[in-house]
């Protein structure tokens, strides 16, 4: 009788430990997903700014610089500096876009695992 009671108590303890581990893993997963969603939102905000402001400014800068250079109002080094600045803006957009896409892929991995 006594060994059986000990085995039951041991099983209950194991069950409680397993449930505790399950809750811990669920919390960690939810926190990870939440963090990915926050990062995606931050990146989306950056992309919106870059699309609506910085990329338009880069386009205007390119047009202005090309026009000024063709009219010989600026030197070649000024032309290069302006083009470099415009290209830096475009490169920044592409880097943020890449980071956004990578974050979406990371988040989707968590959702696709639940279907396996």
Stretch-by-stretch model annotation:
Residues 57-113:
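Short segments within alpha-helical structural elements
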Residues 1-56, 73, 95, 101:
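Sec/SRP-type N-terminal targeting helices
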